[in-house]
């Protein structure tokens, strides 16, 4: 083999090695960048459910309907839905419907327990209770209303820390957390105060 052919073969081999090294360095890094970007995109995706409605009926014929403008599954517990602009309707046999409104709620799809929060309002047969929080235990048929509770009835107003309601017996317990404080009651006289 002549020295001219040997030099040409060496140059071709050198160019091939340079191209291979460049390919491995630059193209493998681009693949990693694309994978990282895809992972960042996946982390930023939020799954929202729009116009959500659940309806549950127990063995006694009582029902609970919960509706929401939007919601998503909790990152921490897959049975919990975090809902926005929520309406809950409780229908107990031989009783008036109870309507609960709130800005947000955490709804357990398995137990039907619901924690309503932010601008909560409960309406029932001419009665209205506003608060910051309301917890409804559907199985036990009770409601616990707390934090900044304001009740308004036909002839009175009431301010307390906690109101507990048994939905079956209609028994209510109203009290303050601090025993030194009293529940504040305003009575209307002759239809006005």
PLM region spans:
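Mature-chain termini and adjacent capping regions
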Residues: 1-193
